[in-house]
């Protein structure tokens, strides 16, 4: 964790100190998993603040920082320790919290918006982070495999969703990285459909999007399964989405512009006449959060770096009819990406 704080200092430029209040960023920098904390990083000091409830937990988890038990107002206590040109996370700090900080900083301190500094460090994964995500991806793959035995037909979408989460937790996951999507038939045309108490029928497609958490790190994987003979046009739609993903995966390489990677899949889907049916971006970063930077989309800024963990997930959604999405979690390298999610991508039929 100390090395991460060192890298943050290197990225701070002219800032003399930086106040971090986002709990995910705090976990990344310190290892603290509690629900109340703040930290300050400068060239001379590493300070961690929490309240009485978490003092012992911080003693076990937080190393390389001076641990400080805050009084009744932790944010005010932290603000008093800021120095010089002081950055704060404007992506996280509310207007009211910013006002409080501004009232408490010592004379001469200049507060400067500095959101995104820690997030940019988080976007490039270390070996241990990749290992945790790979394990989380293996658990989601195993959950998909369990459906071959348990089946889908006759079970409700909600029953399947609950069962997948229970399977991953029983296999060692800390939990699900997001509420699962299990969407059958026309419900699959909703990209983030909520599982219903509705039985899954034969001869339809089912979009399933699941992920696990291991040591705080997330996985994310979508597969579209069949429960028999798919309806007319569904096989062609599946083949289209699969081809778009197959072409986009090798484009996700270090140095590639994020919007250019999106364009590879989007051009294929657009050319097939489904421009209006692919309304989301191609992918997003994954790590301590299931949605983080970088983003792959039509208007995405920046380029991929080696060590980025991103999803590649084209989809086509026909309202009132059917939906198809195929998603892999990959680690960006200088060449072909490393794919962490292993369940087959040819159309799998599950009874």
Task: Kindly give the residue locations of the regions a language model identified.
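Active-site neighborhoods and metal-handling regions in enzymes and metal-associated proteins
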Residues: 1-351
């Amino acid at each position: 964790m100390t090395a991460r704080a060192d890298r943050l200092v290197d990225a701070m430029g002219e800032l003399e100190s930086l106040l971090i209040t986002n709990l995910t960023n705090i976990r990344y920098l310190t290892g603290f998993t509690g629900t109340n904390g703040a930290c300050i990083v400068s060239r001379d000091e590493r300070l961690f603040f929490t309240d009485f409830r978490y003092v012992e937990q911080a003693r076990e988890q937080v190393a390389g920082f001076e641990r400080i038990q805050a009084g009744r107002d932790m944010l005010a206590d932290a603000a008093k320790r800021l120095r010089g040109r002081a950055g704060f996370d404007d992506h996280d700090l509310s207007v009211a919290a910013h006002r409080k900080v501004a009232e408490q900083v010592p004379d001469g301190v200049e507060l400067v918006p500095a959101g995104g500094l820690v997030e940019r460090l988080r976007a490039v994964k270390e070996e241990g982070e990749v290992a945790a995500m790979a394990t989380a991806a293996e658990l989601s793959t195993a959950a998909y495999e369990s459906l071959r035995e348990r089946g889908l037909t006759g079970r409700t979408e909600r029953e399947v969703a609950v069962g997948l989460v229970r399977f991953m937790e029983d296999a060692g996951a800390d939990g699900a990285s997001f509420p699962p999507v299990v969407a059958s038939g026309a419900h699959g045309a909703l990209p983030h459909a909520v599982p219903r108490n509705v039985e899954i029928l034969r001869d339809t497609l089912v979009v399933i999007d699941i992920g696990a958490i291991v040591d705080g790190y997330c996985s994310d994987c979508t597969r579209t399964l069949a429960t028999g003979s798919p309806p007319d046009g569904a096989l062609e739609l599946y083949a289209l989405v699969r081809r778009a993903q197959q072409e986009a995966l090798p484009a996700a390489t270090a140095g590639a512009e994020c919007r250019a990677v999106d364009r590879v899949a989007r051009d294929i889907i657009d050319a097939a006449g489904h421009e209006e049916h692919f309304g989301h971006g191609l992918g997003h970063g994954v790590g301590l959060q299931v949605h983080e930077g970088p983003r792959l989309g039509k208007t995405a800024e920046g380029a991929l770096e080696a060590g980025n963990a991103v999803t590649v997930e084209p989809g086509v959604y026909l309202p009132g009819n059917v939906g198809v999405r195929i998603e892999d979690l990959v680690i960006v390298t200088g060449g072909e990406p490393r794919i962490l999610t292993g369940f087959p991508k040819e159309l799998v039929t599950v009874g």
